[in-house]
Amino acid sequence: MCDLIEPQPAEKIGKMKKLRRTLSESFSRIALKKEDTTFDEICVTKMSTRNCQGMDSVIKPLDTIPEDKVRVQRTQSTFDPFEKPTNQVKRVHSENNACINFKTSSAGKESPKVRRHSSPSSPTSPKFGKADSYEKLEKLGEGSYATVYKGKSKVNGKLVALKVIRLQEEEGTPFTAIREASLLKGLKHANIVLLHDIIHTKETLTLVFEYVHTDLCQYMDKHPGGLHPENVKLFLFQLLRGLSYIHQRYILHRDLKPQNLLISDTGELKLADFGLARAKSVPSHTYSNEVVTLWYRPPDVLLGSTEYSTCLDMWGVGCIFVEMIQGVAAFPGMKDIQDQLERIFLVLGTPNEDTWPGVHSLPHFKPERFTLYSSKNLRQAWNKLSYVNHAEDLASKLLQCSPKNRLSAQAALSHEYFSDLPPRLWELTDMSSIFTVPNVRLQPEAGESMRAFGKNNSYGKSLSNSKH
């Protein structure tokens, strides 16, 4: 069962503002060190606080900052506020199929600890953390605050994606950039895009990501009418792997959509664009409900709920699952929130207090506004679900109007839909690709091979599609 996040008490706001200011000022002083000429993942400082049940919970820095721009003054320092502490952080796993949502103690005290890892760097070779370490090759995409380039490391020759965020003198560093960097620095998983480096100058903040060839949206556009069932299964498994990893670390992605799921030329799927992500365990005000692209936004958020849990992401998983199989978006609203809800209720039924306890208390739920629909079998709306064993059952457990009824990522990985996959997939380490397991590979889609499609690059669209 999903607990609710408690609002931050007024007397704690001052402390969180101090944390904001300290971390924001420290952001410009990041000194990235490498032990050799290969890429190495970077870590985020984790602070532990006692929660209501007396268990350690994880706080990711910067996630209590209000969603505005943070002014950063450049100074020089070797202090890195994002290094891991020496103490180990305990994680709590859900004991049932429900999504995870933890309450944090209002009396908890934050005490960051920093451990430095020093290593010499070659005085003659370009260094990580400096603009001259990378060569721009071509422009991939552009957003309101950021431009994404395909680039190459001068250290080891590997391709990278350079997300260059323009800093305004008056506005400072965009907050979503700080949030994305602070979270990604601590995430090490094969199914999460890797942040290699951060470069800060007076004019720009550059996030250096691993280079990935395309995204799921473009892949589905290239192969209309639904993907190969075996490929759907492998893509979904990887998506759930990545989500399970971040959810166990109390992080919500909050913006799941095909454009934010990158796909390499070997078929690896990677979660990207963490500009809207949040660490759930941080005491704060309830979150903005303007966070997820409309088609993939869950009904509880559409109805005004701001009490989020990992269940928020699982609705998006269900929508993406159906879209991969059917070849069309599950709920392609054309007008507004009202239209989006009508499309959902047409399939799942108009909710009431019996089917969704508490729905009448949601700010935007007005029964008289909605047509009364009865729920349908999902195959009536999306017939291709009936062609794949156990697909309809899994989709129905993800697409639940009541968030507490949605399957968690960890539970979904154990669903019978995946029963024909090799058992070794569940034994992989976090950084191991599923394609290291024998006989696990993508099948050719109708019309074109994966390799040919990989040449049609859309990576820049995904990285520049954030709020930056």
Curated annotation (Swiss-Prot):
PROSITE patterns: PROTEIN_KINASE_ATP, PROTEIN_KINASE_DOM, PROTEIN_KINASE_ST. It is found in: Cell membrane; Cytoplasm; Nucleus. One of its GO terms (biological process) is G2/M transition of mitotic cell cycle. GO terms for cellular component: cytoplasmic cyclin-dependent protein kinase holoenzyme complex; cytosol; nucleus; plasma membrane. Serine/threonine-protein kinase activity is promoted by associated cyclins CCDN3 and CCNY and repressed by CDKN1A. Found in a complex with LRP6, CCNY and CAPRIN2 during G2/M stage; CAPRIN2 functions as a scaffold for the complex by binding to CCNY via its N terminus and to CDK14 via its C terminus. Interacts with CCNY; CCNY mediates its recruitment to the plasma membrane and promotes phosphorylation of LRP6. Interacts with CCDN3 and CDKN1A. Interacts with SEPT8. Interacts with 14-3-3 proteina YWHAB, YWHAE, YWHAH and YWHAQ. This is Cyclin-dependent kinase 14. It comes from Dasypus novemcinctus (Nine-banded armadillo). The lineage of its organism: Eukaryota, Metazoa, Chordata, Craniata, Vertebrata. The gene is CDK14.
